[in-house]
Design a protein with these regions (language model features):
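Polytopic membrane enzymes that build or remodel cell-surface glycoconjugates and lipids
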Residues: 1-431, 452, 463
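Small-residue (primarily alanine) positions within well-ordered alpha-helices
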Residues: 116-119, 170, 177, 390, ...
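Small-residue hotspots
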Residues: 147-154, 163, 170, 295, ...
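Structural signature of tandem alpha-helical TPR/SEL1-like repeats
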Residues: 369-375, 400-414, 435-449, 471-483, ...
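Conserved alpha-helical positions within TPR/SEL1-like repeat arrays
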Residues: 389-396, 424-434, 459-466, 493-500, ...
Length: 633
């Protein structure tokens, strides 16, 4: 049975995608955004729950509102737990579905199989798209694209209700879809050639405006908008050109590109000239080759929300932002190449296949960098300069790897040197220094800097308290824990840590009192330590150890012929450990040789036997003393 050509193309798409991305089944989560969205998010880690669903619908954590994306992460946890490989594969499956849907959409709209397939394969396999697919935290990209393509497909079919539903779901996945109405207008121009149907799209523009307002409000409230350098028009214009260049030569890709201190004016001028020239040519040729204008303005329009005119975040640009915009450039190449090489179909096919194979090869290598945080950020440091985010995250990862603290400190020190105002990096450097012999005071200094830079966060106070406790400055540590709890009463584990510090204070006071010759007060302090923290075993252990010390001193005094001193030491030992049978027995022995102390000695022997009925020495000593007593007593 012969399969239809479209089905073969879909199957080849799926095979190519899984050939490139199947390796991610063995990958870990990374320490950049994955903790906020999945691994350290208590709501997501519970899986699907009623409370979690309500949180997903209302949460603006991490300066974003995308409830559908949050629910998808919860569903992953519900189905697969915290197995990172399955979380990766779910993103791959969504990417595969979006790629197939893109092909079917273009086929439906244009009827041109080969160019439609080329665009779909470029979308599926381009190295710039690896970040969106291989990064668990970028689930929002693949979900947004899937709903975007569904809305376009429904529009081509004339199913208006589905267009609205898909658009709303897309907005709830990632607000970048706000430009959907513009892409529908471009479809009207080409390939549908319907003329502009603006009126029917007014509800979609209203939804887009609402989504844009929500996004701006949430990101400003979450601190994602950089108020010190809010507008970045120069970098935005240059970035458009860089994105085009990276599409055709995807080398030196990294998870983070540092924002430049300044953008050279001549770079901006060249970018403006290039963008204007291409735009003018696209408009000029809109009659003969309308796909050029449709593709070019798709690229410009869909990239506009994230191009950085209003700065959101610290990055200059990001590979993931090209996930949907690249389709416009691919359309220009696919249909333009078809026209230019119409007389050479074999050459056209060979070039298309070669381009797709090259994309797949580079993408496969790029996917490999996402294996874990070390491979990801080490590669970023190789292909970028002054990358403080890569230094910071690599250092944080290495802090948790056995025997690699010196490397961690090196990377974290570079991070704070490159970006002195990065409070989290100072905090993480402090953690690494606290684990480095002889660097505890340096760690405390870093935590002080972090507290200054992050005055609204309880985390630096917790880290400071941990370091102060490690340094033995327990009263100061207790005060920092109290500050952290005032700022965040539900801060995980802080109450337990503060209890341990308070218990340690009583424990150390007890030890000091014991050494100072105040056993009763010492025992009371040790008991208080146990009352505060029942898991605080050291108090009991120390009490027994101190009892043993005084017991041995008593033995030494007895052997040296100093019974009074021996009795005092045995009595002190019993204050620390009242159930010390040997101390009762030996106290009885020294008391039995003291005039008028026979009854006290007998009481000590009897207590030793009560504690240890099989204690033969105590029994023999008791019998011997009772036989020596005068009759009638």
């Amino acid at each position: 049975m012969r399969l239809p050509a479209d089905l073969w193309i879909c199957l080849l798409l799926l095979a190519a995608i899984f050939g490139v991305y199947a390796q991610s089944r063995q990958f870990a989560f990374v320490n950049y955004d994955d903790p906020d969205y999945v691994t350290a998010n208590p709501h997501v880690r519970q899986g699907i729950t009623a409370d979690g669903a309500l949180w997903a619908l209302t949460s603006t954590e991490a300066a974003n509102w995308f409830p559908v994306t949050r629910l998808s992460h919860m569903l992953d946890v519900q189905l697969f737990g915290m197995d990172a490989g399955w979380h990766h594969l779910v993103s791959v499956l969504i990417h595969a579905a979006a790629s197939v849907l893109l092909f079917l959409l273009l086929m439906r709209a244009t009827g041109a199989r080969a160019p439609s397939a080329f665009v779909a394969f470029v979308f599926a396999l381009h190295p710039l798209h690896v970040e969106s697919v291989a990064w668990v935290a970028e689930r929002k990209d693949v979900l947004c694209a899937l709903f975007w393509f569904l809305a376009l497909w429904a529009y081509v079919r004339g199913w208006r209700a589905l267009v609205i539903v898909a658009f709303v779901l897309g907005l709830m996945s990632k607000p970048m879809i706000v430009t959907l109405p513009l892409t529908l207008l471009l479809l009207d121009m080409w390939p549908l050639k319907r003329g502009l149907r603006l009126r029917e799209k007014l509800p979609l523009f209203a939804l887009a405006a609402a989504g844009a307002v929500v996004t701006i409000v949430v990101q400003k409230a979450g601190g994602a908008v950089n108020p010190a350098a809010m507008f970045g028009l120069g970098n935005a214009l240059v970035s458009y050109v860089v994105y085009v260049a990276k599409t055709f030569w995807p080398a030196g890709l990294a998870v983070f590109y540092p924002y430049p201190e300044r953008v050279a004016l001549w770079h901006v001028a060249l970018a403006v000239a290039a963008l204007a020239a291409i735009s003018w040519q696209a408009i000029r040729l809109r009659g003969a080759r309308p796909y050029l204008a449709a593709g070019w303005f798709w690229f410009l329009a869909t990239l506009l929300p994230v191009i950085g005119i209003v700065r959101v975040g610290e990055q200059a640009r990001a590979d993931r932002y090209m996930y949907v915009p690249m389709i416009g450039l691919a359309v220009m190449v696919a249909w333009g190449g078809t026209d230019l090489l119409r007389k050479w179909p074999r050459l056209r096919g060979a070039l298309a296949i070669g381009a797709c194979v090259a994309c797949a090869g580079v993408a496969w290598a790029q996917v490999g960098y996402w294996r874990n945080s070390e491979t990801l950020f080490a590669h970023a440091l190789e292909v970028t300069t002054d990358n403080y985010i890569a230094e910071h995250n690599l250092g944080t990862y290495l802090t948790d790897q056995p025997g690699r603290l010196p490397e961690a400190v090196t990377h974290l020190e570079r991070a704070v040197r490159l970006q002195p105002e990065l409070g989290q990096a100072h905090s993480d450097l402090g953690i690494a220094l606290a684990g480095t012999p002889g660097r505890l005071e340096d760690a405390i200094a870093e935590f002080r800097t972090a507290m200054r830079l992050r005055p609204d966060s309880e985390v630096p106070h917790i880290n400071m308290a941990n370091a102060l406790a490690q340094a033995g400055r327990l009263k100061e540590a207790e005060a920092e824990y109290e500050t952290a709890l005032r700022m965040q009463p539900d801060a995980p584990g802080v109450k337990d840590r503060m209890a341990r510090v308070t218990a340690e204070m009583h424990f150390q006071t007890g030890v000091a009192l014991a050494k100072g010759g105040h056993p009763s007060e010492a025992a009371a302090e040790l008991d208080t330590a146990v009352e505060i923290d029942p898991a605080y075993k050291d108090a009991h252990k120390t009490s027994v150890a101190l009892a043993q010390t005084h017991y041995q001193a008593g033995i030494a005094f007895a052997q040296a012929g100093h019974p009074s001193d021996a009795a005092a030491e045995f009595q002190t030992a019993l204050r620390f450990d009242p159930d010390f049978a040997e101390a009762h027995n030996n106290l009885g022995v020294v008391l039995s040789d003291m005039p008028g102390k026979e009854e006290e000695a007998i009481a000590q022997f009897r207590e030793a036997l009560r504690l240890r009925p099989e204690y033969d020495d105590a029994r023999n000593n008791l019998q011997s003393l009772e036989e020596r007593r005068p009759p009638g007593r």
